[in-house]
Curated annotation (Swiss-Prot):
Enzyme class at the top of the EC tree: transferase
Keywords recorded for this protein, A-Z: Aminotransferase, Antibiotic biosynthesis, Pyridoxal phosphate, Transferase
Functional pathway: Antibiotic biosynthesis; neomycin biosynthesis
Protein name: Neamine transaminase NeoN
MF annotations from Gene Ontology: pyridoxal phosphate binding; transaminase activity
GO terms classed as biological process: neomycin biosynthetic process
SUPFAM superfamilies named in the record: PLP-dependent transferases (SSF53383)
Described purpose of this protein according to its UniProt entry: 6'-oxoglucosaminyl:L-glutamate aminotransferase that catalyzes pyridoxal-5'-phosphate-mediated transamination for the conversion of paromamine to neamine in the biosynthetic pathway of neomycin. Also able to catalyze deamination at C-6''' of neomycin.
Cysteines paired by S-S bonds: none
UniProt record similarity statement: Belongs to the class-III pyridoxal-phosphate-dependent aminotransferase family.
Named cofactor requirement(s): pyridoxal 5'-phosphate
Length: 416
């Protein structure tokens, strides 16, 4: 257990033990993590979905190692890697211009502030998690702007329709796409509403971009005016990107930061994007994830455990019937060395081969055995589905409901 976490001002998201202390890992390779006791874990967290290729991918590692020696560019100025990364992103995600940043949070903030300046409109209508920046904190009164001019519509298209009645004040609608709790039809209606109102649509694909396919996951559904990607770019290295209309992103010309040309990060992005462009890692992830889900769903059913699984092999989420069962599920998984992202989305990497999957399936079977006291419990209901979706989306899952139901759900979930 780390002795220095109390010195850290932040409280970063990371795997923690039953006493909420950070777990300490000493090594990582492929789909495996090793903790300080020598225990080996199978990693479904993968740095919150940013390790797409697997830990220590040899191609990325070799590129980074070479750049670290000074043999492939310098932090002082431009290198060929800058051009390569820009060209790859443009080919994969489109747009007239592309900007580079160090985190998804920074990229989204820069993108929406640029759009706000370019349009001259004050409001941002938001749905989903856009990073740690306080600008996204919801206001105390639902459907009212916060101090930064952001209004959250919580993925409810009825609320968005109300907010778009005065489109002349709206700089952009900003959404973080989710493919576990929202259907393609939801996105098509969102695009229709934005187009009808003449409002810019920003897709914050920090999490899902490049993971589902070689490009934006909503390219055909939303055709966003501005996009942001990050986690699929560099296999865990600190880089993100913004792209879209030259007019809307013109204010980014003022952006510069000291580590812009840092060669190891650019090398990682270039190497990872070359792989991502083939579609092979995404296919491997989907196939491995789907196989695990088939086993997990059957194991849960055979054990009569009231746990659903939302999503597919690319990203999925456990939906336990109760919070007590949810806590027990993740506790049992920890005991068996399955490192899940507690309460959030699970994502395998392309390093999940036959041996890893076989071991993961055996461990999950033992997880279900540990949960035997919960067999035959109350079934999963809508309250559980909304609660779990809220944990991953910061918003409401797609389901039929009226305005009164929406208001009640928001009051309860925001209070929790």
């Amino acid at each position: 257990m780390t002795k220095n976490s109390s010195l850290l001002a932040e409280f970063p998201t990371c795997p923690r033990d039953e006493k909420d202390r950070p777990r300490v890992f000493t090594a990582a390779s492929g789909a495996w993590l090793t903790d300080e006791s020598g225990f080996r874990w199978i990693d479904f967290d993968n740095a919150r979905g940013s390790i797409l290729l697997g830990h220590g991918d040899p191609v990325v590692a070799e590129a980074v190692a070479r750049a670290a020696t000074g043999a492939d560019g310098t932090a002082t100025g431009w290198s060929r890697r800058v051009d390569a990364v820009l060209e790859r992103l443009h080919a994969l995600c489109g747009g007239e211009v592309v900007g580079l940043f160090r985190s998804g949070t920074a990229a989204v903030r820069a993108a929406v502030l640029a759009v706000r300046e370019a349009t001259g409109r004050p409001l941002l209508l938001s749905a989903g998690y856009h990073g740690y920046d306080p600008m996204w904190y919801p206001s105390e009164a639902p459907l009212e702007p916060n101090a930064d001019g952001v209004v959250d519509f919580f993925f409810d298209l009825g609320l968005l329709r109300e907010l778009l009645r005065a489109p002349e004040r709206v700089a952009a609608v900003v959404v973080s796409p989710d493919h576990m709790h929202l259907s393609p039809g939801w996105y098509r209606e969102l695009r229709r509403l934005c187009s009808a109102a003449g409002v810019v649509l920003v897709a914050d694909e920090v999490k899902v971009g490049l993971r589902y396919a070689p490009g934006l996951s909503t390219a055909e559904l939303l055709a966003p005016d501005v996009w942001v990607v990050a986690k699929g770019m560099a296999n865990g290295h600190a880089v993100s990107a913004v792209g879209g209309s030259r007019r809307l992103l013109k204010p980014l010309k003022e952006v510069s930061f000291t580590s812009f040309f840092e060669p190891t990060i650019l090398a990682a992005a270039d190497a990872a994007l070359a792989r991502v462009a083939t579609g092979e890692p995404q296919r491997a992830v989907r196939e491995a994830g789907d196989r695990f889900l088939r086993h997990a769903r059957k194991a849960l059913d055979d054990a009569s455990l009231p746990v659903e699984i939302a999503g597919d092999g690319t990203f999925f989420q456990f939906v336990p019937a109760t919070e007590e069962l949810e806590e027990a599920l993740y506790g049992a998984a920890n005991a068996e060395g399955l490192l899940f992202y507690a309460g959030d989305n699970q994502g395998v990497s392309a390093a999940f081969d036959e041996a890893v999957l076989g071991e993961a399936e055996r461990r999950f079977a033992r997880v279900c055995e540990r949960l035997a006291p919960y067999a035959g419990g109350e079934p999963v209901g809508d309250a559980a589905r909304y609660r779990v979706a809220w944990n991953v989306m910061d918003g409401l899952r797609q389901a039929p409901r009226d305005r009164e139901e929406t208001t009640g759900l928001l009051a309860r979930l925001l209070d929790d």
